[in-house]
Structures are given as C-alpha cells and as structure tokens.
Curated annotation (Swiss-Prot):
It comes from the Bacteria. The keyword Lipid metabolism does not apply. This is Type IV methyl-directed restriction enzyme EcoKMcrBC. It comes from Escherichia coli (strain K12). One of its GO terms (cellular component) is endonuclease complex. Modifies the specificity of McrB restriction by expanding the range of modified sequences restricted. Does not bind to DNA. GO terms for biological process: DNA restriction-modification system. The keyword S-adenosyl-L-methionine does not apply. One of its GO terms (molecular function) is type IV site-specific deoxyribonuclease activity. Keywords: Restriction system. The gene is mcrC. Pfam families: McrBC.
Length: 348
C-alpha cells in the first residue's frame, strides 16, 4: 500500500500552517521555484526571506566587544592590559557594548545558509543565491547550530517575519544529515516518514481549524478518566487523554482525530473494515467529555485520501460520528475548500 501522495508544494503549505504563519503563504511565489523538491522550496523561501530582511534592515543589538584602544572604554581587562604592556603606549584592553548585526537570530540565519550551500542535491540556482546572500553578511558570525540556539529565541522580541524565517531555518537544520562527501549534507526524506508526516498532518489540521473556522473555538482538550482508586498516586499513573482537535460551535462540540495512515481500512479474512483502534479511541474521548449544558457532541476521524475517497456518518451509542478523507494531492485552493466543506457538514 502506497503512502498518501502529497505534492511538495502542499507539504510546504502544511508546514506554514503548522508553524502558525498563514500570511506568509501568499508571499512566496512557488511557481517561480527552479527546483522540484522540498529542500529546493525551503531554500528558495529562505533566500527570499533573508533578502527581504536585508532590505528592511537586519536587526541590531548590543554585544560585548573586546579591543585594544587608546584610553579607557567600558570595562578594563586588567590582566590582558598588563600582560601586553599596553599601558606603556597609553592603551588598554577594554570590553564595551557595541551595536551591530551580530545577533543570535542573524547568526542562525547565516549558519543555516552555510548548511544550505553544502547540500548535495540543492538546485544550483538556489545554491548560488544562498552563497551570494551569505557573502553579504560579513559582520555576522556563524554557529554550530543546536536545538538550544532556537529555543533561546522562543518568545523573543524578533518580528513576526523574522520568526517565520527562523522557523524555515530550524526545519532545514533539523532535517540536514551528513552526506556522502565530507562536509556536505543531504536532506532527510521527511515526506516518506509516516510518523513525521502524521505529526505534521495533526498540527496542520489543528492550525487550519483554529484560523479558518472563525465562528467556532478550536482547542486541544484534556479529558479526565472516569476512574477511582484507593490512592491519588495510582490515579496519577493513568495516561493523560488529549484530543487532537476540539471544535466548539454554537450548535455542537466536535472532537476531531487526525489519522495519517497508508490506508483508512484494515483487512481481515478478506474483508475491509475501518481501523477499530481509531474508532475505540474516538469513542473513549466522547464518553469522557462532560457537556455542561446538554450540548450536542460528535466525533470525526479524518484521514488523508490515498486510494479511496470516503465520507460516512453514523449514530453510535447516541453520538454523531463521521469518518472521511481529504485529498491532499489536489491544488491548494481545492484542499482549502474541501476542508471547509467537511467541517461545515460535520459541525451541523
């Protein structure tokens, strides 16, 4: 069974939703990209992002700078000053703050460009653009990037567009692995990893609902087990139930479970059935939900379309249950409209 076939442009759109940067989708003309894989798209978007930031003016910040200078400025480094006999010449080794472009965000961007340039299968035009941008950042140092560098920027003062560019950097860095040639990289085959794509699919659908279903409230709900024990310690061992998506409209509470599988069906003794564990999980969520004012409650299992388009609706144990697919292989405006139609139908 093949995995869902999703064009790389649509994977980029899904990433942009998952990162929370819906507005930036419109700023990248993906039709103009010379390459044809996800790395080429991300490299193209990064180049355009760095160019736009440079035109706006890269962010500045005060950074400690140590120099041999005439007189005194800031803090004197006494040991270095005495050891170098600088006082004999009326000079000191001083450390003082200097306003420049050598900030953490800019270092991350330049360091990512350095990695991008060394990718073995990157489109040559995109590589040349990245190399040109790298050379235009001489006052910015590079880093051996780690997850901690990106975590330092979370919630920082960077502008929204800076944060978008950093998100692209983070994805490129996290999916760059050593290539066959020393000092080079190859891009991890992200879209072929079912676990990674499943996480992306869940995040994408959550952000889509949160941003596009403006008349409803989209959250992730934490549900409590209807359980008792002789000790609180025993209860604490129970796993936490968290929904992928909970949508509350004026008419209904809809719990959505996003499942990214090679097939929506399991086969046993020659007969196709929906995956039982998915339906059991959804039903458990519904049984655990405690409506406060007699709200109408329903559930929806939504899969990517692989080989069969599915749209079914049932009444199970008094709950309105839907199982459907969305075709992620079509043009993006069609995906957008299909999802709106699905949620509009199942929220009624």
């Amino acid at each position: 069974m093949e995995q869902p076939v999703i064009p790389v442009r649509n994977i980029y759109y899904m990433l942009t939703y998952a990162w929370g940067y819906l507005q930036e989708i419109k700023q990248a003309n993906l039709e103009a990209i010379p390459g044809n894989n996800l790395l080429d798209i991300l490299g193209y978007v990064l180049n355009k992002g760095v160019l736009q930031l440079s035109r706006r003016g890269l962010e500045l910040d005060y950074n400690p700078n140590t120099e041999i200078i005439p007189g005194i400025k800031g803090r004197i480094e006494f040991a270095k000053t005495i050891r170098g006999f600088h006082l004999n010449h009326g000079k000191t080794v001083s450390t003082f703050d200097m306003l420049n472009e050598d900030t953490l965000a800019n270092r991350i961007i330049k360091s990512t460009l350095a990695i991008l340039i060394k990718h073995e299968k990157l489109n040559s035009t995109i590589r040349d653009e990245a190399r040109s941008l790298y050379r235009k950042l001489p006052g910015i140092s590079t880093l051996h990037l780690t997850p901690q560098h990106f975590s330092y920027l979370n919630g920082g003062k960077n502008t929204r567009y800076y944060k978008f560019v950093i998100s692209v950097c983070k994805f490129i860095v996290n999916n760059s692995i050593p290539g066959q040639n020393k000092g080079h990289y190859r891009f991890y085959d992200f879209e072929r990893n079912e676990k990674e794509m499943s996480l992306l699919y869940q995040k994408f659908l959550y952000e889509f609902c949160r941003r596009e279903l403006t008349s409803a409230n989209t959250t992730r709900s934490y549900l409590k087990w209807d359980a008792s024990s002789i000790s609180d310690q025993s209860l604490n061992l129970l796993p936490r139930m968290e929904t992928d998506i909970t949508i509350r409209s004026s008419e209904k509470i809809l719990i959505v479970d996003a499942k990214y599988y090679k097939s929506i069906f399991s086969r046993r003794m020659g007969t196709e059935k929906f995956h039982s564990q998915n339906l059991y999980q959804l039903m458990n969520y519904l049984w655990s939900l405690k409506p406060e004012n007699g709200e109408n409650i329903g559930g929806l299992l939504i899969y990517p379309h692989v080989d069969t388009a599915v749209k079914h609706r049932y009444k199970i144990n008094g709950f309105d249950i839907g199982l459907c697919t969305v075709n992620l292989g079509q043009e993006w405006p069609c995906i957008h409209q299909e999802l709106l139609d699905i949620f509009d139908e199942y929220l009624k």
